[in-house]
Amino acid sequence: MMEIKPIGYVKNNAEEDVDFDELVSIIEILPDYVDGLYRIEECDELEIIFYFHKSSSYKLRVHPHHDPTQPEVGVFSSRSPNRPNFLGLTRVKLLKREGNVLFVKGLDAFNGTPVIDIKPVTRRDQRK
């Protein structure tokens, strides 16, 4: 069995119809993991892995953006939060760090979302 523990939580005032691209969120890192932030402010962009805590079920076929006028696609061809393992991944801009708190822009997660991992975006990730 696999055990995954949150390293922190998202704090924001996001509603269902928010423009996540412009939303500034706080990621509050738990005390046991703060040392893992060492030199993170040298990164411009981060990839945030999180748990869709508001999802409770999934389908293997979905309509993109929950729009029934769009043709169905497989869940792995979509950004749907209703996935078999309820994991999300978003690239964000790191605005600043204050102790155990990261200020990021563009995170498509709601208040209270558990953060599972953080990775820097590297040149390798930007290859076409």
Please describe what each predicted stretch is.
Residues 1-91, 95-128:
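Glycine-rich, low-complexity intrinsically disordered segments
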